[in-house]
Amino acid sequence: MEAAAGERAEPGNLAGVRHIILVLSGKGGVGKSTISTELALALRHQGKKVGILDVDLCGPSIPHMLRAQGKAVHQCDNGWVPVFVDQEQSISLMSVGFLLENPDEAVVWRGPKKHALIKQFVSDVAWGQLDYLVVDTPPGTSDEHMATMEALRPYRPLGALVVTTPQAVSIGDVRRELTFCKKTGLQVIGVIENMSGFTCPHCAECTNVFSSGSGEELARLAGVPFLGSVPLDSQLTRSLEEGRDFIQEFPKSTAYSALTSIAQRVVHRMSALCS
């Protein structure tokens, strides 16, 4: 993996990771962790080996979405061994949720302690060989984002996915997120609009619960790619609540088509960053 200009990446536990993707959102509640989880599953079904690093320290929801809560993190000579969420060991996950004695325990830490854990997650987790490392970040632009960027900056290619919903208030937050990417030199892979209409489970008709097309218009104005829209889907919601593989179990759903298409576009965009 190449180092950024003026920096040198020391050999370490990210040496076998080919691509790193940060998933960002300007505000909470837009389905950022949903997109991170389903992107990882879609990439796995394309034959990729994927890791998920959950640095949303105060809201670690991905272990539940992948039915991995309660699993233990073990030590090896190279550091922490991530939790494998499938028998094939094609998706590995590291989250603060595995380090809490009680899953309902609140993480009430000051900045330095959060920074130290994020740095440890980046340097001390034995990821092995991965095609993609998906990093699920907290909402907004906080100290955790800066700590994550500083830890990952020496590694390339590194890009960001920005998740939004159609509402105007969410779009305004995404503008600030794109400004954050520009100021920190983080390349934007593209914008994803989540909750883009509701798909009826009976007739498959899509109804716009909110406005429509705002994410695509924002991407156009910002000069970044628009990767697609994901509709509200009751099957997707149920899969996340039950920790099931939506991509495998519901290939005929509208959300499946959207998510797999987005995953393919992400692969193409990350390949372009390598060239």
Swiss-Prot record:
Cofactor binding note from Swiss-Prot or TrEMBL: Binds 4 [4Fe-4S] clusters per heterotetramer. Contains two stable clusters in the N-termini of NUBP1 and two labile, bridging clusters between subunits of the NUBP1-NUBP2 heterotetramer.
Annotated localization: Nucleus; Cytoplasm, Cytoskeleton, Microtubule organizing center, Centrosome; Cytoplasm; Cytoplasm, Cytoskeleton, Cilium axoneme
GO biological process entries: cell projection organization; iron-sulfur cluster assembly
Residues reported to bind ATP: 26-33
A GO CC term assigned to this protein in UniProt: nucleus
The protein's required cofactors: [4Fe-4S] cluster
InterPro entries: Mrp-like_CS, Mrp/NBP35_ATP-bd, NUBP2/Cfd1_eukaryotes, P-loop_NTPase, YlxH/NBP35
Expressing tissues: Widely expressed.
Binding site for [4Fe-4S] cluster: 200, 203
GO molecular function, one term: metal ion binding
N-acetylmethionine sites (modified residues): 1
Function in brief: Component of the cytosolic iron-sulfur (Fe/S) protein assembly (CIA) machinery. Required for maturation of extramitochondrial Fe-S proteins. The NUBP1-NUBP2 heterotetramer forms a Fe-S scaffold complex, mediating the de novo assembly of an Fe-S cluster and its transfer to target apoproteins. Negatively regulates cilium formation and structure.
Annotated protein name in UniProt: Cytosolic Fe-S cluster assembly factor NUBP2
Gene: Nubp2
